Amino acid sequence: IKFEPPLPPKKAHKKFWEDDGIYYPPNHNFP
């Protein structure tokens, strides 16, 4: 499974978006 939604700059460094409740696994590479 790949997680590649557009990432808001202020949250791009987080593994979890509090606002959206979206979780990313530790091995997910953020742009």
Swiss-Prot record:
Compartments where found: Secreted
Entry keyword set: Antibiotic, Antimicrobial, Apoptosis, Cytolysis, FAD, Flavoprotein, Hemolysis, Hemostasis impairing toxin, Oxidoreductase, Secreted, Toxin
Disulfide bonds: none
Coiled-coil region: none
Any one GO MF annotation of this record: L-phenylalaine oxidase activity
Oligomer and partners: Homodimer; non-covalently linked.
Protein name per UniProt: L-amino-acid oxidase
Gene source species: Bothrops mattogrossensis (Pitviper)
